[in-house]
Curated annotation (Swiss-Prot):
Residues the record marks as carrying a glycan: 19
Activity-regulation annotation: Ceramide synthase activity is inhibited by sphingosine-1-phosphate.
Name of the molecule in the record: Ceramide synthase 2
Chain's gene name: Cers2
Transferase recorded as keyword: yes
Domain TLC: from-to ranges: 131-332
């Protein structure tokens, strides 16, 4: 049965146009073609990325944070309380008023003390400013290098300027070492993002992040299997064009450089809209949906690839909505902070802030300006 499933999975009609077989893509006459076995290396490379990231954050990002004067906020810790901790872990982090009253009776604390405990406990679980800065530094470094590498791999190719050449001779298109390594490194990086997502800074579009990472990995794997390598390299280079701008804006945001952060955000928003909402649908998607049909009848691989492209495009539209809304409020002077951000909760509104707490709050508010996230925009 397993052999039957294996044979069906690799059935040529799922992956290749009619009248073509895997034998047509065997290496010969010095020409090398993409193979599924090539991707085995991406998993150990993903683990290597995690190791490199650890040392980068420790020996590069942390000293850089100190140089830019990235300061932590002093957080008041919730005192140990077994009753409240059990509820926090099992029932929820934000109890309703009726639950606050019940917990007050069970713990012997006043309702106000219970609410204060949960605020402090939630703040304990929020990532520190240094953690956010180190994560943004790592992603900025990778995305900048990846964008430069992507341009180097694609800009001298004829299909960079004439998208019809993406399909010229398809699928009998050999690959060169630069394309191979560009694919392996990009796929390895996205594997590493998926592996570390549970420990990374969790934002409110966490589910969209997972969908994006999974869709990207599937697209990269499928495009390699089916030898959509020319289209794949263009898509990766286009995606990396805006990500490093976003991560650099976040770094300056955490460092308190408001003007630099805001200016970089505006540049990021412009580049994101141009690349994801203009070039992607009207050039790249047109290239992958229309041009292949001029050469071959539609086949499963054609539909599957373009379906996954449509999933990515929907995520682009989702994120662009928030970017444009933020940009509008930013321009009109109404934006105080990112509406979707996971804000630190303060106690000053209820008159509970001590002198030390007030000092900490003033440091927090100095960091209250807009920023989005990553390979796909998210919020801090």
């Amino acid at each position: 049965m397993l052999q039957t499933l294996y044979d069906y999975f690799w059935w040529e009609r799922l992956w290749l146009p009619v009248n073509l077989t895997w034998a047509d893509l065997e290496d010969k006459d010095g020409r090398v073609y993409a193979k599924a076995s090539d991707l085995y290396i991406t998993l150990p490379l993903a683990l290597l990325f995690l190791v490199i990231r650890y040392f980068f954050e420790l020996y590069v990002a942390t000293p850089l944070a100190a140089l830019l004067n990235v300061k932590e906020k002093t957080r008041l810790r919730a005192p140990p309380n077994a009753t409240l901790e059990h509820f926090y872990q099992t029932s929820g982090k934000q109890p309703k008023q009726v639950e606050v009253d019940l917990l007050s009776r069970q713990s012997g604390l006043s309702g106000r003390q219970v609410e204060r405990w949960f605020r402090r406990r939630r703040n304990q679980d929020r990532p520190s400013l240094l953690k956010k800065f180190r994560e943004a530094s790592w992603r900025f470094t990778y995305y900048l290098i990846a964008f430069v590498a992507g341009m180097a791999v694609t800009v001298d190719k004829p299909w960079f300027y004439d998208l019809r050449k993406v399909w010229e001779g398809y699928p009998i298109q050999s690959i060169i070492p630069s394309q191979y390594w560009y694919y392996m490194i990009e796929l390895s990086f996205y594997w590493s993002l998926l592996f570390s997502i549970a420990s990374d800074v969790k934002r409110k579009d966490f589910k969209e992040q997972i969908i994006h990472h999974v869709a990207t990995i599937i697209l990269l794997c499928f495009s390699w299997f089916a030898n959509y390598v020319r289209a794949g390299t263009l898509i990766m280079a286009l995606h990396d064009a805006s990500d490093y701008l976003l991560e650099s804006a976040k770094m300056f945001n955490y460092a308190g450089w408001k003007n630099t952060c805001n200016n970089l955000f505006i540049v990021f928003a412009i580049v994101f809209i141009i690349t994801r909402l203009v070039i992607m649908p009207f050039w790249i998607l047109h290239c992958t949906m229309i041009y292949p049909l001029e050469l071959y009848p539609a086949f499963f691989g054609y539909y599957f690839f373009n379906f996954m492209m449509a999933v990515l495009q929907m995520l682009h539209i989702f994120w662009a909505y928030f970017i444009l809304r933020m940009a509008h409020k930013f321009i009109t002077g109404k934006l105080i902070e990112d509406e979707r951000s996971d804000r630190e909760e303060t106690e000053s509104s209820e008159g509970e802030e001590t002198a030390a707490g007030a000092g900490a709050k003033s440091r927090l508010l100095a960091n209250g300006h807009p920023i989005l996230n990553n390979n796909h925009p998210k919020n801090d």
